[in-house]
């Protein structure tokens, strides 16, 4: 399982990529602590920091090309997160991950509200929907994954090698004016 994020930015990168990179580094630190306590992941985990994402996905693409034979044999998933901010969970990816994503999102508590991150996002979707939309989605908290485009480091994994991918993050509660700056 490959977990990645880029570390290059157009400007100072306060939101993209630093927020995503901080999350990746904390995940790696916590997994490391768990391993020291005896936890053994069922799969090999790789934490990757890519360069050259902003101009053309250069780092991840070159790495995928250089390691394609091993990746074809061993890689089962790529998980990406460019940005995290205050707000609501969002995800795009290989649709085989929908149930997995929904199960996890239903279990993770939002620290601000105490409800699950899935329920918090559902409440926002419901509040923002028009009348027809409300009647269509009311009571259905299942979150559909959006389709992945070609705009981040998941691209070479899914588009070049066919490795399933997931792009996750949080956002939607701020102006986002600092996206590519500080």
Q: Which residues does each PLM region occupy?
A:
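Structural motif
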Residues: 1-2, 77
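Alpha-helical metal-binding/catalytic segments enriched in His/Glu/Asp
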Residues: 3-57
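Metal-dependent peptidase/peptidase-like ectodomains
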Residues: 50-182
